[in-house]
Amino acid sequence: QGPVYLRFGRLALPVFHDEATFKFEIGKGEQLTEGSDVAIIATGLEVNEALIAAEQLKNEGIQARVINLCTIKPLDEELVVKAAKECGAVVTCEEHSILGGLGEAVAAVLGEQCPVPMRRVGVKDVFGHSGPAWELLEQFGLRSDAIIAAVKELV
C-alpha cells in the first residue's frame, strides 16, 4: 500500500493509555488530559515531557490539554482544529526537526482552518548529534521546561 515509516526511541517510557481498550488507528490522535488554556500536541517521547509540563503548569494555574499524535501523516486534523478552537493557543512538541515535522503539519492545518497563537518545541535548524538520549533532549531544548516556557509565551 505504499511506504511506511516507523520510529522507535531508545528510552523506556510510561504507557499513556489503557492497553486493554486502546485501539491504534492510523491518522487518529488521542487526548490524554483535559485543559482549556493551551493545547500541547506532542508525538513520540515528547508526549511524556508534555505530560510532565502539563502537571507543572496545572500547579501554576494553567490548564493544558495534552494530545498524543501517533501519526503525522495522515494528521488528525479534526482533533487538532478542535483543540485549537477550544484552547485558543497551541504548542507542538517533537523529538525531531521543527522543519518538516509535526509542528509544520499542525501549523499548516491551523493556518488554513483555525489561526491561533502557536509555538513549536523541537530541534531547531541545526545538525544533530549522537549521545545519551536524555543529554540530547536537554542539549536541544526538548525537556518539559522548554515546553513550559513556550506555553508561558502564549498564555
For each feature predicted by the language model, list its residue ranges.
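Thiamine diphosphate
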Residues: 4, 9-155
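Basic phosphate/pyrophosphate-binding loop/patch that engages nucleotide-derived ligands
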Residues: 1
